[in-house]
């Protein structure tokens, strides 16, 4: 049989099968395609940044973990990790990571080693876990278990906080009560728990955090116009910092994660309540990092729970840089010294380097790399 006959028979066979299958009922539901949402600030970003280079973040994360979690590093400011034997909240040793190289407040020789931040510790455990590092048994150390010391039970707040005790806030650096600092560590802790579902001592902490956030949302009753929340007294508070209404996004994220884990309908109710408080805002209240998590929760609720939330305002507020509270806070767009910097989270307005109270009209703002990485967490799954 020559090649032409083989091709003709194969073609006839394919046509026959297509005709047969076209007569059968479809096994798949035909749905409308997802419409691409337009975000004004994204629309003006270049499709291809200049210069362009793909960064191997997977390898960078592994290298970071190997270097930072090596207590045998030597040299000025090294190692970057130390043990904290204060046994705050939980009767065990924990550990700290320098917030900045050579931070004079930190390390084993300063304040008995108690000054460290969960943003660094929990964040690095989460990052290592994402790239396959078992942080529950790394060279004999259970860094996952050590994170329990950030659960502030001794103060009766009973949530994961940025420090192991409030006295750390008095040691310098401006870490007084700042709502996002009290909420965001709980999002990260829930994410870590997802990688280690059977970690000893995690279950009651996760329950406590969810209960506290649910009760707080009930107290707030749709009004998040406060600087922080006292999770011991269950009272909203105000101080010199502007109101952080986007804390509602953090409550919503944790409560929906808790609902996924425990199937308690109260948590689903609380997630919706907190989200709706955020969606009902009339102006942009993006403060630090929590706003895009509200959009993420809304998208998941629409997809998984049959809701129909319009959360386009939350995405716009994340990007636009017109925050009422923190002026200019959003996503940068532009080219600095030949480098496209579009997509970096930070301030879209600059400040005078001599007098920080004066705006510098010549400046195009400044970026925060860690905030940018944090924003990828809720934004990328929505794309």
What are these regions (language model features)?
Residues 141-145, 204, 265-273, 308-314:
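Short sequence/structural elements of tandem HEAT/ARM alpha-solenoid repeats
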Residues 2-11:
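Bacterial N-terminal signal peptides that target proteins for export
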Residues 121-138, 183-201, 239-242, 249-263, ...:
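Well-ordered alpha-helical scaffold segments within catalytic/enzyme domains
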Residues 25-169, 196-227:
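Low-complexity, Ser/Thr/Pro/Gly-enriched N-terminal "stalk/linker" regions
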Residues 20-22:
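C-terminal motif of bacterial Sec signal peptides marking the signal peptidase cleavage site
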Residues 91-120, 163-183, 233-247, 278-291, ...:
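Solvent-exposed loop and edge beta-strand segments that line ligand/cofactor-binding
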């Amino acid at each position: 049989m020559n090649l032409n006959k083989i091709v003709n028979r194969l073609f006839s066979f394919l046509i026959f099968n297509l005709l047969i299958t076209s007569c059968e009922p479809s096994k798949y539901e035909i749905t409308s395609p997802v419409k691409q949402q337009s975000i004004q600030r994204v629309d003006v970003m270049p499709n291809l940044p200049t210069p362009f280079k793909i960064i191997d973040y997977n390898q960078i994360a592994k290298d970071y973990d190997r270097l930072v979690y090596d207590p045998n590093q030597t040299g000025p400011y090294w190692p970057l990790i130390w043990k904290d034997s204060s046994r705050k909240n939980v009767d065990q040793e924990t550990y700290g990571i320098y917030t900045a190289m050579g931070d004079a407040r930190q390390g084993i020789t300063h304040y008995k080693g108690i000054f460290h931040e969960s943003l660094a510790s929990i964040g690095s455990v989460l990052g290592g876990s994402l790239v396959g590092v078992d942080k529950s048994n790394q060279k004999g150390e259970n860094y996952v278990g050590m994170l329990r010391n950030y659960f502030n039970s001794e103060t009766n707040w009973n949530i994961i906080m940025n420090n192991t005790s409030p006295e750390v806030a008095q040691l310098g650096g401006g870490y007084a009560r700042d709502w996002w600092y009290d909420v965001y560590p709980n999002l990260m802790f829930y994410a870590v728990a997802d990688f280690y579902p059977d970690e000893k001592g995690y279950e009651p902490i996760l329950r406590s955090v969810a209960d506290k956030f649910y009760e707080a949302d009930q107290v707030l009753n749709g009004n998040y116009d406060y600087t922080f929340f006292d999770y011991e007294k269950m009272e909203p508070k105000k101080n010199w910092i502007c109101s952080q209404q986007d804390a509602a996004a953090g409550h919503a994220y944790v409560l929906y994660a808790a609902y996924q884990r425990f199937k308690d309908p109260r948590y689903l109710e609380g997630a919706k309540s907190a989200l709706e408080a955020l969606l009902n805002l009339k102006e942009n209240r993006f403060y630090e990092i929590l706003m895009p998590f509200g959009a993420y929760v809304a998208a998941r609720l629409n997809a998984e729970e049959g809701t129909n939330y319009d959360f386009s305002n939350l995405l716009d507020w994340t990007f636009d840089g017109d925050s009422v509270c923190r002026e200019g806070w959003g996503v940068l767009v532009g080219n600095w010294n030949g480098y496209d910097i579009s997509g970096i989270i930070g301030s879209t307005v600059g400040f005078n380097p001599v007098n920080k109270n004066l705006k510098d009209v010549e400046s195009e703002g400044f970026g925060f790399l860690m905030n940018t990485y944090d924003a990828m967490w809720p934004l990328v799954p929505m794309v």
